[in-house]
A protein has these predicted regions:
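Residue-level signal for pocket-adjacent positions within structured domains
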Residues: 80, 104-106, 111, 168, ...
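General structural signal for alpha-helix termini and helix-helix connectors
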Residues: 34-38, 76, 149
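N-terminal strand-loop-strand
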Residues: 70-109, 138, 142
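A detector of low-complexity, intrinsically disordered, Ser/Thr/Gly/Pro/Ala-rich segments
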Residues: 5-9, 98, 132, 173
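Unchanged
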Residues: 116-140, 147-204
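Acidic, metal-coordinating catalytic segment for phosphate/diphosphate chemistry
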Residues: 43-88
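Nudix hydrolase/Nudix homology domain
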Residues: 2-50, 54, 108, 177-214
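Conserved Nudix-box catalytic region and its N-terminal flanking loop in Nudix hydrolases
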Residues: 93-128, 132
Length: 214
């Protein structure tokens, strides 16, 4: 499950400023991490390290986190800085209802999904996250689409997310520490969607319908 949105609510008066700051911080972080990956000159490395520290301070102020904690997380991301990659599953029953999870952190409803672990494909992520969040065992049927979210839009980092049409093969539906409810929904009846999941869900419904055509 992924959720890297700001901890404080933004209003119409300041949301534009927050997005601008997040975009700037993401660019500074990327320059710093890529510089530390490739620079050999010790003076250049010192400058890039300072840039990373400044970005850490900015993220810390914005998300109310200790800058040292942010710095440690950035330092753990070795190699060339890239966008986050996620995988998610859309599982429909025979009546066209979609399996969704109610998130424990904000009470919204969304597709089982999460970040790709090292050595894992996005499709494998969709299967794993569904098992962890719902208890269901699934099989990937088709790729619905690839979605891109720029930094500052519903989260601080760039995100490339692959959403898959899947079929349930077994398992008993159950909640986890990340979810408070698991159930099938008619798309138009979902009370509150999580972030941008509604668009992906409706795209998946069209793919599901196409697969059911004789």
């Amino acid at each position: 499950m992924t959720d890297d949105a700001p901890t404080e609510q933004t209003t119409g008066d300041n949301v534009g400023d927050v997005l601008d700051v997040l975009t700037l911080l993401d660019e500074v972080r990327t320059i710093a991490q890529n510089g530390l990956q490739y620079a050999e000159n010790p003076y250049d490395r010192e400058r890039y390290d300072r840039l990373l520290a400044l970005a850490s301070d900015g993220y810390g102020d914005l998300f109310d986190l200790p800058p040292e904690t942010v710095r440690e997380r950035f330092a753990a991301e070795v190699g060339h800085a890239t966008a986050k990659v996620g995988g998610g599953a859309a599982i429909f029953d025979d009546e066209g209802r979609l399996l969704l999870v109610e998130r424990a952190d904000d009470g919204t409803w969304g597709l089982p999904s999460g970040y790709v672990d090292p050595g894992e494909s996005p499709a494998e992520t969709a299967v794993r996250e569904t098992r962890e969040e719902t208890g269901a065992e699934i099989e990937v049927v088709d790729l619905v689409d690839v979605y891109y979210r720029p930094p500052g839009q519903l989260g601080p980092h760039s995100l490339v997310s692959l959403r898959y049409l899947c079929e349930r093969r077994g398992g008993d539906l159950t909640t986890s520490h990340e979810t408070t409810a698991v159930r099938y929904w008619e798309l138009d009846d979902v009370p509150v969607w999580h972030k941008d999941h509604e668009g992906a869900a409706r795209d998946a419904y069209e793919v599901w319908r196409a697969h059911r055509q004789p």
